[in-house]
Amino acid sequence: MLIRTPHITARSSLDYSKAGGLFCCHLRRPPKQIATNIMIHWNGSTEQARANAFAMPLLHLAERVTVLTVIDGQDVPGPSADQVRKQLRYNGIAAELVSIEREGHSTGEAVLAAARAEGCDLLIKGAFTRNRLRQTIFGGATSYIMQHAEVPLFMAH
C-alpha cells in the first residue's frame, strides 16, 4: 500500500492488517531516491520482524543497510540486533549495527535523529508494538515518527 500524505497519525483509519507493508512519504517533499540507504529500527518486536520480512526486496536493492537499536528505548523481548544482522547476511544483505542513547529524548525523536545523521532515505519500522490503549494514553515511537518523519517510512503491524 502506498500513502503519500503530509501527516498520518496513529488514529488514522489505515487498516494495517490488509497491507503487507505500508510505504509513506511526504506529499510536499517526495524523495529523489529511495531505498539506497535503509535504516531498520530494531526493537525486538514481532511487528518489526514483519516489517523486515515485507521489506526484503527493498533491502536487497540497498547500497547500505543499518540496524539501529535505541538503548533504554521501547524494546520488547525478541531477537537481538546481532541476530537480525546474521539473518540479513544469510539472505545476502550486508548490514551494520548502530546503537544510540536516547539522551533525554523520546525513542521516536532518537530514531529520527539517527536516520537524519546517517543520511537514510528509508526507515523500516514495526508499527504499534504497544496496545491501542497504551498508545492512546502514553503515545509511542510509531505515532511520533509518523507525525514528524522527513524520511520515507516502510511499516508493518
Give the location of each predicted region.
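Structural beta-alpha unit
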Residues: M1, N91-L123, A127-T136, S143, ...
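Intrinsically disordered or low-complexity boundary/linker segments at protein termini
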Residues: M1-A62, T66-L68, H148-H157
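Loop/helix-junction capping segments adjacent to catalytic residues or to phosphate/diphosphate-binding pockets
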Residues: P6, K32, T46-A49, Q74-G78, ...
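Charged helix-capping and loop-helix junction motifs
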Residues: T9-R11, S80-D82, V111-A113, I137-T142
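Short, solvent-exposed coil/turn elements at secondary-structure transition points
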Residues: R29, I71, E101-E103
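Short, well-ordered secondary-structure micro-motifs
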Residues: T36, A51, V76-S80, G108-A110, ...
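Redox- and metal-dependent alpha/beta enzyme cores, enriched for Fe-S-associated oxidoreductases
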Residues: G44-V98
